[in-house]
Amino acid sequence: IEKVAQLSPSCVIWNGDASNTEETIEAQMRIYLQPKIERKDYAARLPYLFCPGNHDERGMANRHLERIWMYRQQDERPSRDWDLGRNFAVRMGDIAMVGLDTGEDKLDADKRFAGLFNNEAYRVAQAEWLRDALQQPEIASAPFLVAFCHIPLYDPRPNLNPGDVLPEDAGDKYTADYAGWQRTCAQLWTPMLEQAGCQIIITAHQHRYRYDAPDETRPWAQIVGGGPIMGFVGEGEKRREAPDRFPTVIEGSVKDGRLQVVVHNCVTGLVQDSFSYAARKVKKVKPPPRPLPR
């Protein structure tokens, strides 16, 4: 919060896992509206946008997050997409920002969910919304396109669970029984983002900062933001330093016609990394005609 206040950005994207299996609206209020922090101007002067994480899907209260965190207005999208209020496509200056919800980190058929989730259809519905959102004049004409979602859409490690395999079918191939990255979402969404010229996708979930540069398999970069651990793991005698575990604030701005991205390490207070991206090729899009006055 202090770093965000220091940077004083035009808006803030909160990239998920703010909560964990919340059952009451009072618990949500303590997290989102009345957090126990020293700064009392939290979210009072800066607009916040929220990309839910997998933990924000769990619990009775989290099924109705809109009671605390206002969903996008229905009049900005067709009736087909009214239930997709957690998605956003907005523009700040020369930067278009798209927010997607990767949902849970396990398959709907996973026995642990007892049939309570329908994320697979939800992700497909978001693909339909994304196709239209990328064609909106204010989005299509922006020199820079940045996408946000909680679970990464790429990972270089072959033994990391891609989220589309049931535990009983995985055998010993993967190191965990939950998704470390989201292959299904990548297959649904990234072809459209690539076609639109998206320069970077900013994700979270893994609790360790990582940068995935563009390569021959994908033209977009990916930043995996750090987690909540402040440089140490373990307790008591087992407590040890973990310099690779730190929260991050990822700052974006346009300078000299390029998108400048700076990754701030919230443990050291130093800049962890910085990157620069050229503008994408955009088509001049004519705004839709205004309706005639009645």
Question: For each predicted feature, which ranges?
Answer:
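A short C-terminal boundary segment appended to hydrolase-like catalytic domains
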Residues: 214, 241-245, 250-294
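Conserved acidic residues
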Residues: 10, 143-145, 199
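Extended active-site neighborhood of metal-dependent phosphoesterases/phosphodiesterases
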Residues: 23-140, 166-180, 188-194, 200, ...
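Active-site glycine-centered loops adjacent to acidic/histidine catalytic or metal-binding residues
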Residues: 16-17, 53-54, 150, 204-205
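N-terminal active-site segment of His-dependent metallophosphoesterases
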Residues: 1-26
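Short, flexible, mixed-charge acidic loops at enzyme active sites
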Residues: 159-166
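Short acidic, glycine-rich surface-loop motifs adjacent to enzyme active sites
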Residues: 15, 137-158
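Residue-level marker for buried hydrophobic side chains located in beta-strands
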Residues: 12-14, 50-51, 147, 202
